[in-house]
């Protein structure tokens, strides 16, 4: 006998209708009985039975069974051809699960529900749309490869343990991740999960990387019970804003590229702001009997291009001086090792060797710059006297680096200049703190009193800023020089004011003075500070400002 397995020739698996096939059979029988008479129906049945017997003589029973199975499959395919395209016109789906038997019900309105998941002993909620499970296929196999969102687009579709089409839609802040599947629009990729990840993701990982997470760990966290346990092809939306970081920490295998994607601005803030903030917070909590902190100085020009995001702390430096004078340990307040290591890293990023760098500084600026930059006269050791923002003379040095065609990192000079500028701005806070710590209380009061008198007498912002610069230089170096060296210090202060970092600090200082509107008897004046740059010959004009008597207290 001839055996032909029609069902295996045209194998359409896992096609489930929206209504049972038994109801379809009853409907067909009703139509036949309604249109034909009973006798004709019996005659038709007898004729059909005779033909069936003749057919069974020629072919085996298995052949007839396979043919009937094929007819049944074709009927399902024709009647419910829109089953795969169900997500094109339906708003939502509702899924009920019972031992891998699923009931599909089409809804005309959106259904939203809250699903509870357990994450590291705590119960967390996330909004999830109901999604369609096409059939009871195998569970999603676990794997340890990292899924990376490339260009915010990555879709995943799997069937019987194999990925067909993969695409994921992720918001820039990674608050919502959408897993969608649509086999009617996208071409299938008949391959296993590991190969697809290696081909489509790992080879393109050098492009725009937004978020990286371990897919298997993500599924284990959010798919612990219920229908989500057997994750099937379909649509799901997860809110992972509060769980993504915990998933990263709890996973041993994850891409380190996500940790390296910190921008230059974030690294600068980490470089400059941590030490001073922790130090100020520690000193504020040491003594509960400390005097109340002075009022905060809020600048009206918050959008000024020279204003840094980290301004000087609004604290009473006199009280801090008492605490530091009691400790008698300036090195504990400001770590020399950390700061010098940062300077070494900045030297390396420019692209020059340290010996060449020292040689250029010695020729262009003289030995004083070497001392201010933390180097001794021989240029071999790093010192703790980081006195002024002009120490490394970064503007002149970067210009030399850009003109040199042999420079290995010519394109990074501007980034290094910005990084050093922000680093110097944060050093201003350290100079204030160290200056108050090194000098005695009597000299502090005398210096501040003389400074106030000079401000009242001269009433020029240029002289006031110059005196402030001298105070910063003297206090940072912890020097007790005679009045005969005042001229040299003024010249050094003028040289300091000509550098770009100090220009930024001066304008920041003036903008803070403009925001002060206290009741004082100091008269108001208008003056222009002409800070001339020898190379560009530019004049920076500063607007009207108002000072008060307790400004530097």
UniProtKB/Swiss-Prot annotation:
Superkingdom in the source lineage: Eukaryota
Q: Return the annotated region ranges for Disordered.
A: 267-305
What are the recorded Gene Ontology BP terms? meiotic cell cycle
Basic and acidic residues bias: start-end ranges? 275-289
Biased composition, Basic residues: where in the chain?
293-304
Instruction: Tell me a GO cellular component.
Output: nuclear envelope
Q: Which UniProt keywords apply?
A: Meiosis
Name-wise, this protein is Meiotic expression up-regulated protein 18
Organism expressing this protein natively: Schizosaccharomyces pombe (strain 972 / ATCC 24843) (Fission yeast)
Query: Which gene is annotated as encoding this protein in its UniProt record?
Result: meu18
């Amino acid at each position: 006998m001839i055996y032909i397995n029609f069902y295996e020739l045209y194998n359409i698996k896992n096609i489930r209708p929206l209504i049972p096939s038994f109801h379809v059979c009853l409907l067909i029988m009703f139509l036949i009985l309604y249109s034909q008479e009973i006798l004709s129906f019996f005659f038709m049945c007898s004729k059909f039975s005779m033909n069936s017997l003749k057919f069974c003589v020629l072919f085996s029973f298995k052949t007839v069974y396979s043919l009937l199975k094929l007819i049944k499959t074709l009927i399902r395919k024709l009647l419910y051809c829109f089953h795969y395209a169900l997500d094109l016109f339906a708003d939502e789906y509702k899924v009920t699960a019972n031992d891998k038997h699923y009931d599909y019900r089409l809804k005309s309105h959106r259904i939203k529900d809250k699903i509870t998941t357990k994450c590291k002993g705590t119960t967390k909620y996330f909004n999830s749309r109901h999604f369609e499970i096409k059939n009871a296929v195998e569970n999603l196999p676990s794997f340890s490869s990292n899924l990376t969102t490339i260009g915010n687009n990555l879709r995943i579709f799997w069937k019987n343990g194999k990925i067909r089409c993969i695409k994921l839609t992720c918001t820039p802040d990674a608050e919502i991740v959408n897993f969608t599947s649509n086999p009617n629009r996208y071409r299938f990729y008949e391959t296993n999960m590991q190969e697809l990840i290696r081909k489509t993701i790992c080879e393109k990982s050098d492009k725009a990387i937004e978020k990286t997470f371990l897919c298997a760990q993500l599924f284990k966290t959010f798919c612990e019970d219920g229908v989500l346990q057997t994750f099937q092809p379909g649509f799901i939306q997860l809110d992972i804003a509060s769980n993504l970081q915990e998933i990263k920490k709890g996973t041993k295998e994850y891409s380190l590229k996500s940790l390296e994607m910190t921008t230059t601005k974030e690294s600068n803030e980490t470089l400059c702001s941590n030490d001073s903030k922790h130090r100020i917070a520690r000193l504020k909590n040491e003594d509960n009997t400390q005097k109340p902190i002075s009022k905060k100085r809020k600048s009206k020009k918050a959008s000024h291009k020279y204003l840094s995001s980290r301004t000087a702390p609004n604290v009473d430096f006199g009280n801090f001086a008492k605490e530091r004078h009691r400790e008698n340990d300036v090195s504990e307040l400001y770590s020399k090792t950390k700061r010098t290591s940062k300077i070494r890293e900045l030297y390396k990023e420019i692209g020059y060797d340290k010996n060449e760098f020292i040689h250029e500084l010695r020729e262009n600026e003289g030995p004083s710059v070497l001392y201010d930059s933390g180097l001794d006269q021989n240029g071999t050791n790093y010192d703790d006297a980081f006195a002024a923002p002009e120490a490394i003379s970064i503007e002149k040095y970067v210009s030399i680096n850009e003109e040199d065609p042999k420079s290995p990192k010519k394109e990074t000079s501007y980034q290094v200049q910005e990084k050093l500028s922000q680093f110097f701005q944060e050093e201003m806070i350290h100079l204030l703190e160290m200056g108050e710590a090194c000098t005695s209380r009597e000299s502090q009061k005398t210096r501040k009193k003389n400074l106030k008198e000079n401000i009242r007498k001269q009433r020029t912002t240029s002289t006031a800023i110059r005196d402030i610069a001298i105070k910063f230089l003297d206090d940072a170096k912890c020097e007790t020089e005679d009045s005969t060296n005042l001229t040299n210090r003024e010249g050094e202060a003028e040289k300091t004011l000509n550098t770009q970092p100090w220009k930024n600090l001066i304008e920041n200082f003036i903008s803070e003075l403009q925001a002060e509107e206290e009741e004082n008897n100091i008269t108001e004046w208008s003056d222009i500070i002409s800070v001339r740059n020898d190379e560009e010959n530019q004049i920076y004009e500063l607007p009207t400002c108002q000072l008060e008597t307790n400004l530097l207290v």
